[in-house]
């Protein structure tokens, strides 16, 4: 794997992981459209670790609160904001893990990795995001997250297992429909990404650990660093822009890309 290819994969993953445009969809399309070899699972795990560190750093105050509450949650007590937040995140993560395991066992996860599927999900869920963003009420703050809303957003998140859907895009869609403002919807979506990336990356990491050699580990470290930088930049810019700008620019991008992919897929 060349350094250019490695950096390209890391930057694409970093820039698209938290924007509502689907990082997995872009990474699947990269080898198909460019002719480059697939980056492999070790690099996949590495760039996800990089983006994980980025979101943890950006929302470090909220993460610290949740981590502080984990101990109380384990003891069956949810009498602090941290324990409640940790429980909400746990509940929101269960659906995607269950559905992800089912797709993996049946082989459907690989069957869905096609340009046509990505084109349709880019287009359809982009339009759904626009509809939710324009019509969704603004009646709640992230601090008023409930267990019921965490479960509902978790069900939305499970749809992100279809390539091209976008984990952040679909959870933001769900949050907007539940009444959360743009910044608060994005914040909840980003916090939900932490246990999801931890769980999926941890399982995949165990699978690929035996495959890695020192040269590959060096590439993985480089990929993680570049993914971290790109993700932190994208996350910072998006959260700032959401104070004054809607999700429409991302929707336009999704619709345009989805349309192009469908034309290519069916031509």
Curated annotation (Swiss-Prot):
Documented EC number(s): 3.6.1.27
Originating organism: Dinoroseobacter shibae (strain DSM 16493 / NCIMB 14021 / DFL 12)
Keyword ATP-binding set for record: no
Catalytic reaction(s) noted: di-trans,octa-cis-undecaprenyl diphosphate + H2O = di-trans,octa-cis-undecaprenyl phosphate + phosphate + H(+)
Record GO terms (molecular function): undecaprenyl-diphosphatase activity
Gene Ontology BP terms: cell wall organization; peptidoglycan biosynthetic process; regulation of cell shape; response to antibiotic
TM region(s), chain numbering: 1-21, 49-69, 83-103, 111-131, 190-210, 219-239, 245-265
Family the UniProt entry places it in: Belongs to the UppP family.
Additional free-text comment from the UniProt record: Bacitracin is thought to be involved in the inhibition of peptidoglycan synthesis by sequestering undecaprenyl diphosphate, thereby reducing the pool of lipid carrier available.
Protein's name according to its UniProt entry: Undecaprenyl-diphosphatase
Compartment annotation: Cell inner membrane
Top-level taxonomic group: Bacteria
Membrane-related topology note: Multi-pass membrane protein
Top-tier EC class: hydrolase
InterPro entries listed in its UniProt record: UppP (IPR003824)
């Amino acid at each position: 794997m060349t350094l250019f290819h490695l950096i390209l994969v890391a930057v694409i993953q970093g820039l698209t992981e938290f924007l509502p445009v689907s990082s997995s969809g872009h990474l699947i399309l990269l080898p198909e459209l460019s002719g480059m070899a697939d980056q492999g699972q070790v690099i996949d795990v590495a760039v996800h670790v990089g983006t994980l560190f980025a979101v943890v750093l950006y929302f470090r105050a909220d993460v610290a609160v949740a981590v502080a509450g984990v101990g109380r949650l384990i003891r069956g007590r949810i009498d602090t904001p941290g324990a409640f937040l940790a429980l909400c995140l746990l509940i929101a993560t269960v659906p995607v893990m269950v559905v992800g395991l089912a797709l993996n066992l049946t082989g459907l996860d690989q069957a869905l990795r096609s340009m046509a599927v990505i084109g349709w999900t880019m287009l359809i869920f982009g339009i759904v995001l626009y509809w939710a963003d324009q019509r969704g009420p603004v009646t709640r703050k992230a601090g008023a997250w409930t267990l019921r809303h965490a479960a509902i957003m978790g069900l939305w998140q499970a749809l992100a297992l279809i390539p091209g859907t976008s984990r952040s895009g679909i959870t933001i869609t769900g949050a907007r429909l539940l009444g959360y403002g743009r910044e608060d919807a994005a914040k909840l979506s980003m916090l939900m990404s932490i246990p999801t990336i931890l769980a999926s990356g941890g399982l995949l990491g165990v699978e690929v650990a035996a495959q890695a050699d020192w040269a590959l580990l060096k590439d993985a470290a480089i990929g993680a660093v570049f993914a971290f930088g790109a993700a932190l930049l994208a996350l910072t810019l998006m959260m700032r822009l959401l104070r004054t700008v809607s999700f429409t620019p991302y929707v336009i991008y999704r619709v345009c890309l989805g349309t192009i992919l469908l034309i290519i897929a069916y031509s």
